[in-house]
Curated annotation (Swiss-Prot):
Gene Ontology MF terms in the entry: K48-linked polyubiquitin modification-dependent protein binding
The name this protein goes by in its record: UBX domain-containing protein 1
Main subcellular location: cytoplasm
Coiled coil: 111-179
Record region (Disordered): 39-61, 127-176, 191-218
Subcellular location field: Cytoplasm, Perinuclear region
């Protein structure tokens, strides 16, 4: 935020705030300029220009010495003071007044500057507190996303271990079937040799029935999602079918979003996912055993 904007936030008129912030002054320098020059202070009690002596006797119409707020009775020096007073109090009724405003003394002006400095300190303290709260929220979200990614990696590792165990069991079963087939063939060969040696007819060798291929069960414990990213590229990633959509979003946000806000949707059937869907498992959202997911920039 610029120095001039900070001064305007504290109640200075725009033109005077710009003047105080000129020459690349920082906030303290601008306040020093205000304190010495006085032109930038949004005082409602600045003294108006005094009419020349005898002006009332010249026959000219009287010149207003000040302006008065008809809502509260406060005397105001000029248009800037009227606008400043109206913005603070929401008062709307003003009129000219012949009553002159007593000029501020040097001590009163210095006290006014100190008062404004104190207001600026309060404003800066509030701003610093707000920034600290925002930083805490960002850090909290970063940690939550990190925990979600760790949980996802652990789930992926467990899934790989289960799949490896399934592969080992399948290989063991296949080896056992092959071993039984070899033993059966050896038995048949022995019987054939015995029959031939005894002059008996050799029994017709019947091929051992091959094990019927067993169709692998449909395992929908996992799903493969293909993402079309914001830059048009596509990537694939596997997730647990019972994982919530929030895990998918966390993975995309960490690896491919590059800090750009986004939404998730499926093209067929078309569905745009909202915050209400983040806790729903992928299986319930019909994203199993595979699905296409498109990233769109958030509005």
């Amino acid at each position: 935020m610029s120095i001039a904007q900070q001064l305007m936030d504290m109640g200075f008129p725009a033109d005077k705030a710009e003047a105080a912030a000129g020459n690349n002054r920082n906030l303290d320098q601008a306040l020093d300029w205000i304190e010495k020059d006085g032109a930038g202070v949004p005082m409602e009690t600045d003294a108006p220009a005094q009419a020349a002596p005898g002006a009332a006797d010249s026959g000219a119409p009287p010149v207003a010495a000040s302006f008065k707020c008809d809502d509260c009775g406060k005397l105001l020096a000029n248009d800037d003071a009227i606008m400043f007073h109206a913005s603070k109090t929401k008062h709307e009724n003003f009129s000219e007044s012949s009553e002159a405003i007593k000029p501020l003394t040097a001590e009163e002006k210095a006290a006014k500057v100190l008062e404004i400095r104190e207001k600026i300190k309060v404003h800066q303290a509030k701003k610093a507190k707000l920034e600290a709260e925002e930083n805490r929220e960002k850090e909290k979200k970063r940690r939550e996303d990190g925990k979600a990614m760790i949980s996802h990696k652990e789930a992926a590792r467990d899934r790989e271990i289960r799949e490896a165990a399934q592969d080992r069991r399948r290989e063991k079963n296949e080896d056992e079937i092959a071993r039984k087939r070899v033993l059966e063939q050896i038995r048949l060969d022995k019987e054939a040799r015995k029959a031939k040696a005894s002059g008996q007819p050799v029994p017709e060798a019947k091929p051992a029935p091959s094990a019927a291929p067993v169709a692998p069960p449909k395992d929908y414990s996992t799903t493969t999602l293909q993402f079309r990213l914001l830059d048009g590229q596509t990537v694939r990633q596997q997730f647990e079918a019972n994982e919530p959509l929030a895990m998918v979003r966390a993975w995309v946000e960490t690896n491919h979003a590059n800090g750009v806000p986004f939404t998730l949707m499926t093209p067929f059937p078309r569905k745009v996912f909202t915050e209400d869907d983040m806790g729903t498992p992928l299986k319930v959202l019909n994203l199993v055993p595979s699905a296409n997911v498109i990233l769109n920039r958030a509005a």
